[in-house]
Amino acid sequence: MKLNPLILGLLLSFSAGHSLADVVLKVPENIDLLSVNMQKPKSEGGLFGDKTIMLKDGTNQIVFRYIPTFDDGDDVKKVYSDTIIAKFESENATLHFKIPSYRNIKEANEKIQTMEWQLVDEKGQSVALVEDKLLNPGVQWGRNYSQEATEYNQNGGVAAIGYLKVVTNEAQLSENTTQVIMSEASQPLEVVGSSNNLTQLQLWYSKASKEERKAFKKWMVDQE
């Protein structure tokens, strides 16, 4: 599929206009952030302190594990929580994880799978969120958490977010005919096809405001 240069130009303007995120998520060393909005997280800092994740205003989804560490003689041992997937909504805020602490490995092993946690702002106010566990009964090493989050959202889990779905009509592929279904939700979920342009379309559309999305949809209709 070949995108009209005007579409790409419009999408580039969306990206430039929204390069500065409005929500800052602080991620401590004992939180393993695995996916953000179905994509590999891009963080700043974090060598000897919290990592910083920049997010857009509105609804976001994260996948993470809590991994507290404990001294055991000359060794350091870790305890792993289940993989948690959660969605939350926030605007113009800096958010921090509020997680339990455990006295020892025994207590961590007993309680970590049922732990209660929160995201709080700089005033200590908790952010409303919906959480679930992203479980995989198979081999845990090498899991593709962003792909698992995408499939989770497609299946409509309790912590699912919406998506932009682009489906290529293979029966009319020679005519480059594509059906585009625009969602009012915030992130891409499924792409059938191999075009890099479609991936860029997903990314830029997800960063656009509601007003820009409406204008973009109207522009697309006018091109037909």
From Swiss-Prot:
InterPro entries: UPF0319. Residues 1-21 form the signal peptide. It comes from the Bacteria. Disulfide bonds: none annotated. The keyword Signal applies. Keywords: Signal. PANTHER family: UPF0319 PROTEIN YCCT (PTHR38108:SF1). Belongs to the UPF0319 family. This is UPF0319 protein VC_1853. It comes from Vibrio cholerae serotype O1 (strain ATCC 39315 / El Tor Inaba N16961).
